[in-house]
Amino acid sequence: MAMRFAHALGALMLGAGCALFSGCASLRPANDLFAGTQDADTNITRYQGRFSARYTQNNAEQSAVGSFLWRERGPDVQLELMSPLGQTLAIVSQSNQGATLELPNQPPRRAPEVDTLMQDALGFSLPVSGLRDWLRARPAPGTPARVARDAQSRPETIEQNGWTVHYVAWTDDGNNTDGAKVGIRRLDLDRPQGTNGPLSVRLVLDQ
């Protein structure tokens, strides 16, 4: 099942169209952590942009592209992955109760943490726990990290938990010293080793 969905995901993200999923039904989270909230809600941290991933599956290099919407409030995170045509392909939710992965035309999958869910279903996994802090230009707490900084004291790289995070581009306000407001434009994540081989992810933030 995981292998079949991974191939379908890759085809959709490369623009093959929505025929792979019957009726192209809109995928909405069964347990929406942000139901009833507004985009302007100051209690919600929101990132929106585009992603690309290169990963190894069955000893062959695979790739996927699309857009994403990340919403975060306290311990709750919800990540929506979409194809270039706008179809929602996967919804990942993480809370104190555990992790949920929802795919079109399949029952929700649940586990204590999200990384294994994504790896099994999609063929690659975004480091959701680390991204909560890396998107704020800081190491995640609780584990060792190596940080290299540029002349403006912004991080150039963070090495943590087997990942290297490269801060490639910043917005005009990127010299803001407040980590919660720092203007990250693009970051690349590389995991050279892992159970399923190397993984590279590029995130470009539009807002």
From Swiss-Prot:
- Residue ranges the record marks as coiled coil: none
| Residues anchoring lipid (S-diacylglycerol cysteine) | C18
Task: Read off the SUPFAM superfamilies from this record.
Answer: Prokaryotic lipoproteins and lipoprotein localization factors
Keyword Transmembrane helix listed: no
Give the UniProt subcellular location, in the record's own words: Cell outer membrane
Would you indicate the residue range of the signal peptide? Answer: 1-17
Name of the protein in question: Outer-membrane lipoprotein LolB
What Pfam family does this protein match (any one)?
Answer: LolB
- Give the family, as the similarity comment puts it: Belongs to the LolB family.
**Assembly and interaction partners:** Monomer.
Name the source's superkingdom: Bacteria
Chief localisation class: membrane
Single biological process term from Gene Ontology: lipoprotein localization to outer membrane
UniProt source species: Ralstonia pickettii (strain 12J)
In this UniProt entry, which cysteines form S-S bonds?
none
Q: Which CDD domains match?
A: LolB
Its biological purpose is as follows: Plays a critical role in the incorporation of lipoproteins in the outer membrane after they are released by the LolA protein.
Q: Which UniProt keywords apply?
A: Cell outer membrane, Chaperone, Lipoprotein, Membrane, Palmitate, Protein transport, Signal, Transport
Q: GO CC terms on record?
A: cell outer membrane
Query: Residue positions of N-palmitoyl cysteine lipidation?
Result: C18
InterPro entries listed in its UniProt record: LolA/LolB/LppX (IPR029046), OM_lipoprot_LolB (IPR004565)
Membrane topology (UniProt): Lipid-anchor
